[in-house]
Amino acid sequence: MNTDGKKLVAYFSHTGENYNVGYIEEGNTHIIAQMISDATGADIWEIAPLKPYPKESYDECIKIAKDELNANARPAIQGDIDIEEYDVIFLGYPNWWGEPPMCIYTFIEKHNWDGKTVIPFITHEGSGMAGTDKRIANACKGANVLTGKGLAIQGKVAQEHRDVARSNVDSWLKGLGFTE
């Protein structure tokens, strides 16, 4: 893995009402994405659905997300970024029912992953990585996806214990060889 190559943090994060943390202005995954970008000097890009999930009702948000999952939907996303120039892509998302949100697959399917190193990181409320890294590996054809080496941080920790979250991010990045 080329830890000195050009790096990108691409992520999806939900704001508004969230499970276990109430109404938030800054999404759990966004917080972790920013920490990774700050520590590694990586560029950062948000994967944003063209039609945002509802912010006022978490129940409505998860209903829509569950419908997308059941339909194997590929919801449109806002804009795009050319990943060709990047060697390493940190890919972040919340774990919803043991799956990345479907907009992550929309992003993945728009790109050629040959020769890229993809490093998943997730936020969750108790389920951990739950095999989502393996699903990312199956979707990112031609990439070296670091399954079993991703980072999983509880959303509540990201929101309410940022010093702990930052320590976890720093230790993880050091273990991967990105920081000293």
Residue ranges of each PLM-predicted region?
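N-terminal beta1-alpha1-beta2 submodule of the flavodoxin-like/Rossmannoid cofactor-binding fold
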Residues: 1-88, 98, 105, 167-180
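Short, conserved loop/helix-junction motifs that constitute active-site signature segments
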Residues: 2-3, 83-84, 109-115, 138-142
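Solvent-exposed loop/turn segments at secondary-structure junctions
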Residues: 14-17, 50-52, 95-99, 124-128, ...
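Soluble non-cytosolic domains of exported or imported proteins
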Residues: 23-27, 98, 126-130, 159, ...
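Generic recognition of short, well-ordered alpha-helical segments
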Residues: 102-106, 131-134
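Short, glycine-/small-residue-rich phosphate/pyrophosphate-handling segment
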Residues: 119-152, 160
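Glycine-rich phosphate/pyrophosphate-binding loop and the adjoining helix
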Residues: 144-180
